[in-house]
Amino acid sequence: MFLLLRFVLVSCIIGSLGFDNPPTNVVSHLNGDWFLFGDSRSDCNHVVNTNPRNYSYMDLNPALCDSGKISSKAGNSIFRSFHFTDFYNYTGEGQQIIFYEGLNFTPYHAFKCTTSGSNDIWMQNKGLFYTQVYKNMAVYRSLTFVNVPYVYNGSAQSTALCKSGSLVLNNPAYIAREANFGDYYYKVEADFYLSGCDEYIVPLCIFNGKFLSNTKYYDDSQYYFNKDTGVIYGLNSTETITTGFDFNCHYLVLPSGNYLAISNELLLTVPTKAICLNKRKDFTPVQVVDSRWNNARQSDNMTAVACQPPYCYFRNSTTNYVGVYDINHGDAGFTSILSGLLYDSPCFSQQGVFRYDNVSSVWPLYSYGRCPTAADINTPDVPICVYDPLPLILLGILLGVAVIIIVVLLLYFMVDNGTRLHDA
């Protein structure tokens, strides 16, 4: 009890002397078991191949280039590689996962499947995709891409129906209509297989609206059927709109198995790529750094929408992105955020990263790691310390049990001694 009171007193004295230990706006790690996924702002290979080699192009400290803990590609993102022919095989593994990518698919690219489509739907898809990625990488160590083999018994081939600018959708694949079908009112199937990973993130997408072809309107209908378990996953078009709709995607987390892709109307779609999730781990929140352009280009907030506690911590700069290499590369604020990767930190929270694990001026919310157990609330004259009550409650219970044991032992020996005297 004396030690506890001394700890409380010392902590309050430290607080009164101004030891704030505030949360810092960085991404960091508990130890060396971490990994970063990124784009050009952390792509060391891209900088090496430029002439001259100018590391001001990156927000990442070049001291980390040889760490072996980075998977980044200039001009790309995990979402872009997942859906489109512009592909990079993001691959990495760690207990603590950090993401700093996403701006290579934003409203600036204005992607939509058809001329009457909607980029807003694709921003919605982006948010749903990253929600699944962040949630699952809080419980899995390893992320990579795998191809999904499929077998379609018809003669029709996949078609590039959904494209805009340089972006061509190839996941899921569209199977063209068979030549002997006069319209799109038909049912068609394809087998696909998932193997080699613990779980997979795969797309299930439909045109949610009335799709017009040759004066006829069609309602999209797509299903995946797990032939091993009998579980079926499906989407049907529910909107009556004829313009301004686009390819709505849901992102399913599926186990290994044999599947059947089924279309009851319009074109059959079948997944061709999947995020491969491997090696379950203890729950560890991921960290996400906002990925946005200079204000001269339009960005979105979908990674922020997807990154929610307790599974994700979001870090952002309070100012416009203004790079020193060019306006979109080498920003001081984001370089500062990534500087936390140069050192270990004991505690992570929604507010930021704590450098020390004793006392803080801010109580950590959604904390992870070895976090401060006390927050000092400074009044003008007297520091008042507020502590996490759980350790005190447990200590009180242990002290109470110890007192009871001592009393029982004393009574036992007193009775035993009295019995011996009586016998004598």
Swiss-Prot record:
<dbReference type="GO" id="GO:0055036">
    <property type="term" value="C:virion membrane"/>
</dbReference>
<dbReference type="Pfam" id="PF03996">
    <property type="entry name" value="Hema_esterase"/>
</dbReference>
<feature type="region of interest" description="Receptor binding">
    <location>
        <begin position="128"/>
        <end position="266"/>
    </location>
</feature>
<dbReference type="GO" id="GO:0016020">
    <property type="term" value="C:membrane"/>
</dbReference>
<feature type="glycosylation site" description="N-linked (GlcNAc...) asparagine; by host">
    <location>
        <position position="301"/>
    </location>
</feature>
<feature type="disulfide bond">
    <location>
        <begin position="347"/>
        <end position="371"/>
    </location>
</feature>
<dbReference type="InterPro" id="IPR003860">
    <property type="entry name" value="Hemagglutn-estrase_hemagglutn"/>
</dbReference>
<comment type="subunit">
    <text>Homodimer; disulfide-linked. Forms a complex with the M protein in the pre-Golgi. Associates then with S-M complex to form a ternary complex S-M-HE.</text>
</comment>
<feature type="disulfide bond">
    <location>
        <begin position="113"/>
        <end position="162"/>
    </location>
</feature>
<protein>
    <recommendedName>
        <fullName>Hemagglutinin-esterase</fullName>
        <ecNumber>3.1.1.53</ecNumber>
    </recommendedName>
</protein>
<feature type="glycosylation site" description="N-linked (GlcNAc...) asparagine; by host">
    <location>
        <position position="316"/>
    </location>
</feature>
<feature type="glycosylation site" description="N-linked (GlcNAc...) asparagine; by host">
    <location>
        <position position="153"/>
    </location>
</feature>
<dbReference type="InterPro" id="IPR008980">
    <property type="entry name" value="Capsid_hemagglutn"/>
</dbReference>
<keyword id="KW-0378">Hydrolase</keyword>
<dbReference type="GO" id="GO:0019031">
    <property type="term" value="C:viral envelope"/>
</dbReference>
<keyword id="KW-0325">Glycoprotein</keyword>
<keyword id="KW-0812">Transmembrane</keyword>
<feature type="disulfide bond">
    <location>
        <begin position="307"/>
        <end position="312"/>
    </location>
</feature>
<keyword id="KW-1133">Transmembrane helix</keyword>
<feature type="signal peptide">
    <location>
        <begin position="1"/>
        <end position="16"/>
    </location>
</feature>
<keyword id="KW-0261">Viral envelope protein</keyword>
<feature type="disulfide bond">
    <location>
        <begin position="44"/>
        <end position="65"/>
    </location>
</feature>
<dbReference type="InterPro" id="IPR042545">
    <property type="entry name" value="HEMA"/>
</dbReference>
<keyword id="KW-1043">Host membrane</keyword>
<feature type="active site" description="Charge relay system">
    <location>
        <position position="326"/>
    </location>
</feature>
<comment type="function">
    <text>Structural protein that makes short spikes at the surface of the virus. Contains receptor binding and receptor-destroying activities. Mediates de-O-acetylation of N-acetyl-4-O-acetylneuraminic acid, which is probably the receptor determinant recognized by the virus on the surface of erythrocytes and susceptible cells. This receptor-destroying activity is important for virus release as it probably helps preventing self-aggregation and ensures the efficient spread of the progeny virus from cell to cell.</text>
</comment>
<feature type="glycosylation site" description="N-linked (GlcNAc...) asparagine; by host">
    <location>
        <position position="358"/>
    </location>
</feature>
<dbReference type="GO" id="GO:0106331">
    <property type="term" value="F:sialate 4-O-acetylesterase activity"/>
</dbReference>
<keyword id="KW-0472">Membrane</keyword>
<feature type="active site" description="Charge relay system">
    <location>
        <position position="329"/>
    </location>
</feature>
<feature type="topological domain" description="Intravirion">
    <location>
        <begin position="414"/>
        <end position="424"/>
    </location>
</feature>
<dbReference type="InterPro" id="IPR007142">
    <property type="entry name" value="Hemagglutn-estrase_core"/>
</dbReference>
<feature type="active site" description="Nucleophile">
    <location>
        <position position="40"/>
    </location>
</feature>
<keyword id="KW-0946">Virion</keyword>
<dbReference type="GO" id="GO:0019064">
    <property type="term" value="P:fusion of virus membrane with host plasma membrane"/>
</dbReference>
<dbReference type="Pfam" id="PF02710">
    <property type="entry name" value="Hema_HEFG"/>
</dbReference>
<dbReference type="GO" id="GO:0001681">
    <property type="term" value="F:sialate O-acetylesterase activity"/>
</dbReference>
<feature type="topological domain" description="Virion surface">
    <location>
        <begin position="17"/>
        <end position="392"/>
    </location>
</feature>
<dbReference type="GO" id="GO:0046789">
    <property type="term" value="F:host cell surface receptor binding"/>
</dbReference>
<feature type="disulfide bond">
    <location>
        <begin position="197"/>
        <end position="276"/>
    </location>
</feature>
<dbReference type="GO" id="GO:0020002">
    <property type="term" value="C:host cell plasma membrane"/>
</dbReference>
<feature type="region of interest" description="Esterase domain 2">
    <location>
        <begin position="267"/>
        <end position="379"/>
    </location>
</feature>
